[in-house]
Amino acid sequence: MSVKIHYQNTHFITSAPDIRHLPEDEGIEIAFAGRSNAGKSSSLNRLTNQKNLAKTSKTPGRTQLINLFKVADGCHIVDLPGYGFAQVPLEMKLKWQRALGEYLQKRQSLKGLVVLMDIRHPMKDLDQQLIIWAVECGIPVQVMLTKADKLKSGARKAQVLKVREEAKTFGGDVAVDAFSSLSGIGVDTLRAKLDEWYAPMLAALAEQEEGEQPESSTDQ
């Protein structure tokens, strides 16, 4: 028996100002991170087929909290604060960067990081710093180049290949694919990656379900 994830059932659990206020460090968490204009909220909404799971904002940098969502038993998505915005004081930027670093380095249940970047402006300094932190911590990374519908097919493929070459310089496990919350490009790829990262928890759930099945009687 296998347990399949129904991403449309994902729901919000809680918000926290920092790692110390998150629920217990258990199960499997997949973190989503990106610059404030990378389309992170729209990507989460498309992934889960929900219009308002993650609140989209016209104001970059609005998401100041760590938001936790339940995908399935023991499986969570963590929406990390956006970074790289211009309209926020330096002190707050530095505070958020420290919080991101602390989360990546200390959260034991973190098993994968999705970094969202605008396909037209990828691999900015903070994007690279985030990937470096993840690689140093042994965390696999899936880069999704968002707003892929903004480029024609040939340009899109060329940009993906270019960023993949850049990603090789980090070492570690860093994959790169195109994504569009508007057209659906890359949605199946992202779900497949999350399925892979959640697999150990799903296997444990399936085993637990089998253990709870009543034994069939062989008595005549």
Curated annotation (Swiss-Prot):
Gene Ontology MF: a single term: GTP binding
Domain EngB-type G residue range list: 26-200
Binding of GTP, residues: 34-41, 61-65, 79-82, 146-149, 179-181
GO annotation (BP), single: division septum assembly
Binding annotation for Mg(2+): S41, T63
Annotated Gene Ontology cellular component terms: cytosol
Cofactor: Mg(2+)
Record protein name field: Probable GTP-binding protein EngB
Organism: Vibrio cholerae serotype O1 (strain ATCC 39315 / El Tor Inaba N16961)
Gene symbol of the encoding locus: engB
